[in-house]
Structure formats: structure tokens, C-alpha cells
Regions:
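Short, structured segments at the rim of ligand-binding sites
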Residues: 1-146
């Protein structure tokens, strides 16, 4: 889809890139890291995502890379995301949801991708997001449960 508006991630004055990391309450919720990561794939600019609190929560990024996202998994806790700036779309694919957090990120990626994606093990997403298909459909998403 063609986009007229977008969003930019701005580097710091010294040229270093923005880093987003999770922390205990009242800090940034670790449950939102995967959503921020997939959203950053379409931004203008780069961001370092740092998952400090949990091991291996970023291991779903290989699925996003398969879809065309520019992500470098630095280690089990950090991923560098280079945004597309809506210049290229993610590509549809078949994938499996490993858990709730990764599943919702993959669902967001699938909704923004060109083509039809299929997410296996979607029950993982249901555990954290009640009636997600119906709620997204009400917002205008082209989504169905098969």
C-alpha cells in the first residue's frame, strides 16, 4: 500500500541511534518490545531494540527477515532494525507463532505485508488478545481465521 505519511526515528546529535529497552514497572513494558520492533521496520531510520529482562524473546525476528525486514540480531537480547520508510513492503509468508508476544508482532507484520500470510499456532495470540480477529476486522483489517 502507498503511504503519504510515515514516522521517523531520529539519531542523536552525536550520530548514535535510538535505543529502546525494557525495564520493570514503571519503565517500558517488555511485552511491548516485539510490537515496537515490528513497527520500526517501516520507520524512516534505525533503532536498537534491547530486551534486557528476558532471554530469547527476539528469536522470532528470523520470520520478519524472511518477510523482507532489515534486522540484525546482535545477540539474544539486542536487535538492530533498519526501517524501510514505507519504500518497500514486507512480503507475505507462512509462519508459526512461538508465543503471545512474538505472535502479535507477526500478526502486525502480516497485516502490513503484501499478499496473504498464514500464521500457524495462532492460539498463542488468543491467550493474550481476546477476540483479536473480530476486533481487527472492526478496525478495517482484512483478516480471517481458518
Amino acid at each position: 500500500p502507498e503511504h503519504n505519511d510515515g514516522y521517523s526515528i531520529v539519531n542523536f546529535i552525536d550520530g548514535s541511534i535510538l535505543s529502546i529497552s525494557d525495564s520493570p514497572w514503571p519503565g517500558f513494558s517488555p511485552d511491548l518490545i516485539s510490537i515496537i520492533l515490528v513497527t520500526a521496520t517501516q520507520a524512516n531510520g534505525s533503532v536498537l531494540i534491547h530486551q534486557k529482562m528476558f532471554e530469547s524473546r527476539l528469536f522470532f525476528v528470523d520470520k520478519l527477515i524472511d518477510m523482507g525486514a532489515k534486522i540484525i540480531l546482535c545477540d539474544p537480547h539486542r536487535a538492530s532494525v533498519i526501517g524501510h520508510n514505507f519504500k518497500s513492503s514486507l512480503k507475505a509468508t507462512n509462519m508459526t507463532s512461538p508465543d503471545i508476544r512474538a505472535g502479535i508482532a507477526l500478526l502486525i507484520a502480516a497485516l502490513s505485508a503484501n499478499g496473504v500470510s498464514v500464521i500457524q499456532n495462532a492460539e498463542q495470540i488468543d491467550r493474550g488478545y481476546e477476540d483479536i480477529v473480530e476486533r481487527l476486522r472492526e478496525l478495517g483489517a482484512d483478516i480471517e481465521r481458518i
